[in-house]
From Swiss-Prot:
Protein name: Uncharacterized protein HI_1215
Entries under InterPro entries matching the protein: DsbA/DsbL, Thiol_disulfide_DsbA, Thioredoxin-like_sf
Organism of origin: Haemophilus influenzae (strain ATCC 51907 / DSM 11121 / KW20 / Rd)
SUPFAM superfamilies listed in its UniProt record: Thioredoxin-like
Record-level Gene Ontology MF annotations: protein disulfide isomerase activity; protein-disulfide reductase activity
GO cellular component: outer membrane-bounded periplasmic space
Keyword set, alphabetical order: Signal
A Gene Ontology BP annotation from the UniProt entry: cellular response to antibiotic
Domain of life per record: Bacteria
Length: 235
């Protein structure tokens, strides 16, 4: 495990409770049970619903991927202290289980907060999606997010990353980006996203910051859930 991931994992552990209530206005989906999160022992091979992960009472209907891989949907916000750390864990997992899972990223958006979706889809449209990861890491610090969340500063930041400022502004205000923002709002509501990071596995199971702060623990829980879905699909 790299020093960068260790440091970010420690930061995530210290701050994971700070993001627990951030999307209170959004309707939260009902989960099957609720328990307190914990870090299990090394010998733990079974994980408990409501403690290590959550499950939707009614799974989200999803179209099957043509490659048959299980979706891992990562809902994030740039105003998040632990999302970059969680992303590192998820990317690691998707690399070691590339034959089983597909990692998909979705910016969280509400009617009152569209910054993350607007910037994410602007970067995607400019073929600069990798800069989203850079921004997510930078804004792990609240002060940096506060600074960059203003129009002038984020445009200046984009220019510093090598993008054409005027093209960035034009794309940011384009109809296609506006439509993607609306889709993000609808998806945030459909999945009942109420905090960040918020990770949905196969439309059935959910991980939050209470699990996504330790790579060994997170990978073990992800393996447990992916294997669980595979067994359910065989029934």
């Amino acid at each position: 495990m790299s020093d960068r991931m260790k440091l970010k994992g420690l930061l995530a552990f210290c701050l994971l409770f700070l993001s627990s209530f951030v999307l209170a206005e959004v309707n939260q989906k009902e989960f099957s049970v609720q328990n307190s999160p914990h870090l299990p022992s090394r010998d733990t091979i079974y994980f408990e619903d409501g403690r290590d992960y959550f499950s939707y009472k009614e799974p989200i209907e999803q179209a099957s991927r043509t490659d048959k891989k299980i979706r891992i949907q990562f809902f994030f916000d740039y105003d998040c202290r632990v999302c970059s750390s969680a992303q590192d864990i998820l990317e690691l997992y998707s690399q070691i289980r590339t034959y089983k899972v597909a990692l998909e990223q979705y910016p969280i958006a509400t009617a009152d907060n569209q910054f993350s979706a607007r910037i994410f889809y602007t970067l995607q449209a400019l073929s600069a999606g990798e800069l989203s990861n850079v921004l997510l890491f930078e804004t792990s610090e609240k002060s940096r997010y506060t600074e960059l969340s203003t129009s002038n500063k984020i445009q200046q930041w984009a220019e510093e990353q090598g993008l054409d400022k005027q093209l960035f502004i034009q794309t940011e205000n384009s109809q296609s980006v506006k439509e993607q923002i609306q889709n993000a709002i609808e998806l945030t509501e459909e999945y009942g996203v109420f905090t960040y990071p918020y990770v949905v596995i196969g439309g059935k199971y959910v991980l939050t910051a209470s699990t996504l702060y330790n790579d060994d623990y997170s990978v073990a829980v992800l393996d447990f859930l992916v294997n669980k879905i595979e067994q359910e699909q065989k029934q």
